[in-house]
Amino acid sequence: MANVSKKVSWSGRDLDDDEAAPLLRRAPRLGVPAGEAAPLLNGAGPAAARASPHSAFFRIGQLSSVELDDELLDPDMDPPHPFPREIPHNEKLLSLKYESLDYDNSENQLFLEEERRINHTAFRTVEIKRWVICAMVGILTGLVACFIDIVVEKLAGLKYRLVKDNIDRFTEHGGLSFSLLLWAALNAAFVLLGSTIVAFIEPVAAGSGIPQIKCFLNGVKIPHVVRLKTLVIKVSGVILSVVGGLAVGKEGPMIHSGSVIAAGISQGRSTSLKRDFKIFEYFRRDTEKRDFVSAGAAAGVSAAFGAPVGGVLFSLEEGASFWNQFLTWRIFFASMISTFTLNFVLSIYHGNAWDLSSPGLINFGRFDTETMVYVIHEIPIFIAMGVVGGILGAVFNALNYWLTMFRIRYVHRPCLQVVEATLVAAVTATAAFVLIYSSRDCQPLRGSSVSYPLQLFCADGEYNSMAVAFFNTPEKSVVSLFHDPPGSYNPMTLGLFTLVYFFLACWTYGLTVSAGVFIPSLLIGAAWGRLFGISLSYITGAAVWADPGKYALMGAAAQLGGIVRMTLSLTVIMMEATSSVTYGFPIMLVLMTAKIVGDVFIEGLYDMHIQLQSVPFLHWEAPVTSHSLTAREVMSTPVTCLRRREKVGVIVDVLSSTASNHNGFPVVEDADGTQPARLQGLILRSQLIVLLKHKVFVERSSMGLLRRRLRLKDFRDAYPRFPPIQSIHVSQDERECTMDLSEFMNPSPYTVPQEASLPRVFKLFRALGLRHLVVVDNCNQVVGLVTRKDLARYRLGKGGLEELSLAQT
């Protein structure tokens, strides 16, 4: 494979030879002089530090010994796949700091014994507990959404009333600059506080959280992503961001919030609060937590948009790595409970206890399908709007990509991140004030349709229409663009608003604040969509079908689809949020067109940020041009193996060694020197840590020093924060003891032959949610180990198949 000639890190500093040397410990190959470097099988240069050739001899407790054909290790052989030799950007890196989650149960003796003890009644009890947890997730997610909505409404109302009174007073007496300073200062103060708690307390709470949850459901362990502290900072941060007037929405973070709630409730304890409620202990493993997090994400979507079916489809389309019929029912149940809880509580809050008219945080309002019909000749127009949405979405993502690269390189300190967020808040308020001040688009005031009408230089009984878009929460601005009657907006007002808000939203996404991109995208699209509808109405002579509100809806769908590239779930979400199936087909056409056009230029926003964070994310399928690659070409070698009965000192050394960077170790039979050591099972680092902590040694067991036999509960109690090996004290005498791994290892790990193609390996690994896949030869000897990073290194780029470089950062 090709060597990578340049190592790029976020610090922008290359590794020189002296720095790269310790990362590789190359064993000499037979026939290669001792001082000569052996070639790399896996194609990564010194910076990758992941593959070294096979040693000539089997060293139990250290390296696998199976040699490969000499021709495969020939340094003079041309690489069969010409990969690029220059890696210029961060998205060409794959970070080694991310670990994988265990979405495959280790079927060792302890696990099988416990499963055999579960009778029909116990099994039914476990199933009932699953439904109870999903109900609790739905209720709590709905309550959190209510809390966010009520607090935002109160604080935003207080801020806008204060600024409005100030503007009205100074409009008469002069001195509107004081109003500008007040507005900018209030926005900056809220955002300063919101950014500070995110940057200094829990950085993973930044953004919408959707990319992080996608990675979690994909099988990547993102530190702190589902902790209680993250939830508290997320909720507080999104309130402060929205009240601070940023071009953000509170709907996206609800997905992250629901996921954190699900992850916490399903474990029956809080490691942050150090409280164990001794319930739901059976679900303390990654496989169970993954399913509940899927339900939490769906409940978040349901609470945000009042779209329970859309929530289920969102979990399916955007994240879930495992799916079945029973899981679908539970996720749908959690989504329905979430939207009902939100509906019920908000109805009581608004004084309509039995009305149940608030199904989500945002309600797009019901479109009158009798008057706002669409005709067959509008379908090409909708497709054209999808093309525009795809192009604008690609421009948005491209600008945000370069902005994110700049932030990674130069705005990586928390204090600088807070300063940038505060600056954006002040600039947003200033831009809004200047546009409102400059606008002369005055419209007659219609009852209470406008929440905070600004008169400024308009006549009595009129309001400034530019203020409706800026001087309001983004959710209410979207509804205004959808439902305000024709003639409510001047085309110049909509054009200026679209242009300014587009760049403000692009600048805002990626700040160190808790915020989402759903509502800003809808608002941008609704603005240019309404402008499109006004133009069409003018051209057609105010035809009945050319309603600006209808085209505002299509523009909103096109813009959001062009940015995030979701089709199935977004179609249903928009249908449920508008309470109308009539526009289902046009919305689907618009979203599909926007995705197809946008994908021609650049990835979707969430996938782009996942790549920029160098996360080893596995897509649904392997790269289409990767069939010529085999398992032996992508696997990690050499492999650290352990014997069934291994010395404690060897295990401690293996776990302490930085060279043993895998979290799974093949277990081989005790070789007597005459027979090759064959694969017997696989044991995880976390299991070895628990065994060492409880000192499960053969000698102690034979002397009766073990108080009891280790149970599966002991491993669940240590989950998920297993102690580091440095915290476990092992005396010199204990190092000479022996540990029997037979009872704790997985005796039937998944294996593949070394000739298996990459797509076949990828399909097995991805479909089963594996963390380790052992590569064996015809004699069942360990040849290598395939991990998530080995598969994620290969992807289809513009010039064909690309191989990413591995980095420690």
Curated annotation (Swiss-Prot):
Give ranges for the Cytoplasmic compartment: 1-130, 602-809
Q: Which positions does the site annotation Mediates proton transfer from the protein to the inner aqueous phase cover? A: E318
Indicate what this protein is called per its UniProt record. H(+)/Cl(-) exchange transporter 7
Record-level GO cellular component terms:
intracellular membrane-bounded organelle; lysosomal membrane
Tell me which species this is from.
Bos taurus
Short motif (Selectivity filter part_1): ranges: 207-211
Where does this polypeptide localize?
Lysosome membrane
Per the record, membrane topology reads:
Multi-pass membrane protein
Stated role: Slowly voltage-gated channel mediating the exchange of chloride ions against protons. Functions as antiporter and contributes to the acidification of the lysosome lumen and may be involved in maintaining lysosomal pH. The CLC channel family contains both chloride channels and proton-coupled anion transporters that exchange chloride or another anion for protons. The presence of conserved gating glutamate residues is typical for family members that function as antiporters.
What positions does the domain CBS occupy? 635-699, 745-803
Q: Does the keyword Ion transport apply?
A: yes
Where does the source fall among the domains of life? Eukaryota
